[in-house]
């Protein structure tokens, strides 16, 4: 009886499909057109969602005004830079300036300071990160800073990591927003309690860094077939810290909401573009928190800031690639910040 019932159901289903197909053939568009229409609607919905979120980013951007004084639109500190890695902190700090911060500081190891100073006279460089009193030297600047970017060019020297651990602790005590990238994320993977539950932290891991964090925090491998769920779960496990997983599409979550940034970029993946993202994010986080949830329509200010930084980085990548193709570097991308910012947020 079971076999007959199953066969009967299958026959009935086939009849229904045949009737629907005949009706579509006579009175409606072909099935492939229906599917194409459904896909187009979903794509249009996605584009609309992105545009709505970009509008929230526009809402948090402070207007330029001759009545403001130097420093009002952002004083950002970058913590990182060692003997081996001097480019990353420069990229992050100069990107912060290009996006619209008024002042950009770099707190680096003494060996990195002359090199970073030589890159740009516009950066304020402090050669203190490897000193015995590094935490105190950075802490005394915290009242003057609106946000920290921790990790670019940091390296994994034990003494530097201990100092950065102390800097993160005093920054949390002062309620300073922190963006954590690169080897700052390696430190967090070793000590997740450092930022657990700190709602003014944003983590910006790439695929490898995300996998390491996920395994350290959730004690198991991530589900490669469920990227959205993996980012959501990691954020929740960290106490709803905002997480930005960089990749073909950037996936963002604060443990309650998931956003996807699919702004067009390019197929070029040059080293350093993550530093552009972290530096610009430091500025946007400050602006978003200053603007408050009323300007973000109730959405998380940090999620809105992160979406803006991801969109900007991708747009810079796209514009630079149009000019330079395979030879595109992060310096080419940084040169596009002004035009990309205007295109996304000021048109």
Curated annotation (Swiss-Prot):
<comment type="similarity">
    <text>Belongs to the NnrD/CARKD family.</text>
</comment>
<dbReference type="GO" id="GO:0047453">
    <property type="term" value="F:ATP-dependent NAD(P)H-hydrate dehydratase activity"/>
</dbReference>
<keyword id="KW-0523">Neurodegeneration</keyword>
<dbReference type="GO" id="GO:0005524">
    <property type="term" value="F:ATP binding"/>
</dbReference>
<keyword id="KW-0520">NAD</keyword>
<feature type="binding site">
    <location>
        <begin position="206"/>
        <end position="212"/>
    </location>
    <ligand>
        <name>(6S)-NADPHX</name>
    </ligand>
</feature>
<keyword id="KW-0325">Glycoprotein</keyword>
<comment type="function">
    <text>Catalyzes the dehydration of the S-form of NAD(P)HX at the expense of ATP, which is converted to ADP. Together with NAD(P)HX epimerase, which catalyzes the epimerization of the S- and R-forms, the enzyme allows the repair of both epimers of NAD(P)HX, a damaged form of NAD(P)H that is a result of enzymatic or heat-dependent hydration.</text>
</comment>
<dbReference type="InterPro" id="IPR000631">
    <property type="entry name" value="CARKD"/>
</dbReference>
<keyword id="KW-0521">NADP</keyword>
<dbReference type="InterPro" id="IPR029056">
    <property type="entry name" value="Ribokinase-like"/>
</dbReference>
<dbReference type="GO" id="GO:0110051">
    <property type="term" value="P:metabolite repair"/>
</dbReference>
<dbReference type="GO" id="GO:0046496">
    <property type="term" value="P:nicotinamide nucleotide metabolic process"/>
</dbReference>
<dbReference type="Pfam" id="PF01256">
    <property type="entry name" value="Carb_kinase"/>
</dbReference>
<feature type="binding site">
    <location>
        <begin position="246"/>
        <end position="250"/>
    </location>
    <ligand>
        <name>ATP</name>
    </ligand>
</feature>
<keyword id="KW-0456">Lyase</keyword>
<dbReference type="GO" id="GO:0005739">
    <property type="term" value="C:mitochondrion"/>
</dbReference>
<feature type="binding site">
    <location>
        <begin position="265"/>
        <end position="274"/>
    </location>
    <ligand>
        <name>ATP</name>
    </ligand>
</feature>
<keyword id="KW-0547">Nucleotide-binding</keyword>
<protein>
    <recommendedName>
        <fullName>ATP-dependent (S)-NAD(P)H-hydrate dehydratase</fullName>
        <ecNumber>4.2.1.93</ecNumber>
    </recommendedName>
</protein>
<feature type="glycosylation site" description="N-linked (GlcNAc...) asparagine">
    <location>
        <position position="297"/>
    </location>
</feature>
<keyword id="KW-0496">Mitochondrion</keyword>
<dbReference type="GO" id="GO:0005759">
    <property type="term" value="C:mitochondrial matrix"/>
</dbReference>
<feature type="glycosylation site" description="N-linked (GlcNAc...) asparagine">
    <location>
        <position position="240"/>
    </location>
</feature>
<feature type="binding site">
    <location>
        <position position="153"/>
    </location>
    <ligand>
        <name>(6S)-NADPHX</name>
    </ligand>
</feature>
<feature type="domain" description="YjeF C-terminal">
    <location>
        <begin position="53"/>
        <end position="344"/>
    </location>
</feature>
<feature type="binding site">
    <location>
        <position position="275"/>
    </location>
    <ligand>
        <name>(6S)-NADPHX</name>
    </ligand>
</feature>
<keyword id="KW-0067">ATP-binding</keyword>
<feature type="modified residue" description="Phosphotyrosine">
    <location>
        <position position="85"/>
    </location>
</feature>
<keyword id="KW-0597">Phosphoprotein</keyword>
<keyword id="KW-0225">Disease variant</keyword>
